[in-house]
């Protein structure tokens, strides 16, 4: 009896440690991946369950030390947004890498690049409008704080201020915390999919294997959540205003610095060294810039 009591005490204590807890409500138990189609172009959004006290950051990152966050359930793009999807929605392909794909790869399935943060915002709304089951009523981004005026392509051209309504279920940019949690893939690995430098070539296109060009998505191994290219190919815009100091541990669904003049960028790219491809690595860029090594991936509420 005494031995049983000790075991029960140990198990009870274990339930109150700092380990992350996936919150599986009845509703979330039905949360699954979802495939969308826009005029024959399919893309997959992977389901990520909510988490309490999930560990992000790393000790070797000066602007992203270890800290915990709690996140509501969400979906995130299996891949970076491709050139074919961007062109279908926006009627043009702005990419620097718009021709001469690597041998055997399909040009239209390379990630879109050379897009500003504002243009990504407009794209998310345009895609939401075109998606069956969503439509304009589910657009996330607005040009006014009362959420009356849908953010448009014209707003993006004028770099108008963006207001985000996270209660909407349309497509959007992931937050930094959502992006990093997804990149880790349910593990504690340094890169998306692996903790071994020698294995990084199997998961990411970066300086040692890219030949300085972007590549068709889904050509490398996925991470634990079934996501591709989160440590390489193109780096990715996220929603958050950048601040060198992240919020204290314990925040629920953090969205970044509302007054920052720059936006956070995540993930490695084809000319980055391995250190800059780590899941916890972060930097920033002015939202109006159009880097030829920068794209994005989608997120949405389930």
How should each PLM-predicted stretch be described?
Residues 32-39, 46, 52-60, 67-69:
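Short acidic-hydrophobic surface loop/beta-edge motif
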Residues 17-18:
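C-terminal motif of bacterial Sec signal peptides marking the signal peptidase cleavage site
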Residues 55-57, 70-196, 202, 240-244, ...:
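Active-site microenvironments of metalloenzymes and redox enzymes
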Residues 25-47, 162, 168-171:
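GGW-centered surface loops in extracellular recognition modules
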Residues 4-12:
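Sec-dependent N-terminal signal peptides
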Residues 157-168, 201-231, 283-286:
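Short, well-ordered junction/capping motifs at the entry into regular secondary structure
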Residues 63-67, 187-188, 210-213, 230-302:
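Surface-exposed recognition segments
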Residues 47, 96, 111, 190, ...:
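Conserved beta-strand positions that form and line the central face of beta-propeller blades
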């Amino acid at each position: 009896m005494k031995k049983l009591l000790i075991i029960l005490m140990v198990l009870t204590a274990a339930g109150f440690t700092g380990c992350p807890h996936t919150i599986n409500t009845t509703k979330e138990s039905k949360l699954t991946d979802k495939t969308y189609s826009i005029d024959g172009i399919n893309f997959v959004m992977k389901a990520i369950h909510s988490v309490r006290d999930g560990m992000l950051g790393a000790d070797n990152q000066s602007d992203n030390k270890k800290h915990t966050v709690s996140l509501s359930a969400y979906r995130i793009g299996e891949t970076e947004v491709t050139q074919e999807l961007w062109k279908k929605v926006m009627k043009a392909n702005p990419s620097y890498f718009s021709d001469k794909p690597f041998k055997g790869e399909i040009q239209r399935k390379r990630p879109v690049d050379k897009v500003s943060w504002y243009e990504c915002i407009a794209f998310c709304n345009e895609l939401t409008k075109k998606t069956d089951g969503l439509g304009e009523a589910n657009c996330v981004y607005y040009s006014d704080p009362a959420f009356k005026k849908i953010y448009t392509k014209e707003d993006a051209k004028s770099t108008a201020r963006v207001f985000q309504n996270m209660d909407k279920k349309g497509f959007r940019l992931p937050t930094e915390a959502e992006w990093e949690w997804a990149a880790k893939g349910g593990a504690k690995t340094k890169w998306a999919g692996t903790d071994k430098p020698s294995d990084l070539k199997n998961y990411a296109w970066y300086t040692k294997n890219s030949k300085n060009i972007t590549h068709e998505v889904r050509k490398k191994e996925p991470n634990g959540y079934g996501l591709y290219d989160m440590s390489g190919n193109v780096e990715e815009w996220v929603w958050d205003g950048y601040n060198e100091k992240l919020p204290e541990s314990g925040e629920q669904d953090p969205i970044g610095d509302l007054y920052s003049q720059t936006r956070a960028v995540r993930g490695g790219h084809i000319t980055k060294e391995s250190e800059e491809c780590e899941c916890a690595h972060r930097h920033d860029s002015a939202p109006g810039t159009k880097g030829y090594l920068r794209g994005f991936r989608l997120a949405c509420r389930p």
